[in-house]
Amino acid sequence: MGGGSDGDCIDNHVVTVIAGSGDSDIWLYSLQRNTLTRLTTEQGNKMGPLWTPDGKRVVYSAATRSHGMNVMWIPVDGGGAQQVLWSGSESPMLIPTSLSPDGKLLLIDRLDAGGRGFDEWVLPMAGERQAHPLLQSEFSEQWGVVSPNGFWLAYVSDETGSSEVYVQSFPELGNRVQISELGGFEPAWSRSGHELFYRTGDKVMVVPVETEKHFRAGTPQALFEDHYDYSDYDIALDGAHLLMIKGQNESSPTHLNVVLNWPEEWKRARP
């Protein structure tokens, strides 16, 4: 599946799903009707699908043998062909991770040419669309996601020797805060911006946060623990459901799990 996680959900009814053996494609899955509609048809493996804020397009990356890595988008109503936003053929991997709330900036995980680690890049969605690095160092920085109010960036860095979740101001970086304590990856903001989720091992963690004039974070708490064969997930618009991906076995199709009802102690701990 796909999105700021691979279960990106523009509303509570339709999510993007990546499926296929060999070349993969992006499909739209209706939670209400339990139906799949194919969105992409070109050759190559697709990664990182994201809905644009207006719900009219899906952004994704595609890896092909002839054209390398490209970041693209496609209308979801079938009214037009896919369009290349950024050609990054010199990089072995590009993965869109987040769009700013106004849809003007796209964050992309870019694997360096030597394959040593990821850097976080930004692609303006208007004008000449010249991508530039946002977080780039000898360490790996990835999984960048912008907060719902557009003021903060959550991401993962391995600068301490293990992957940890951090938050900095955005788009001008500064005021960095470490969020995870014992490892973390794949951060995701709640739609309200009052919680920050991340994963560590088989646990989904949640942290109460304040994101208005200043950023403040509470103590991470384990929301639940379960084994999921795929790491990607997303938070529903109502903030009360998580969409997870769980493989049944190697020969059967993947199914979606909707996790309901946060623990009562977490509800009481919210600011």
Q: Model-derived features: where do they sit?
A:
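Conserved beta-propeller blade repeats
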Residues: 1-18, 43-63, 88-111, 134, ...
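Beta-propeller blade-edge and WD-like acidic-aromatic loop motif
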Residues: 18-38, 47-48, 54-57, 61-86, ...
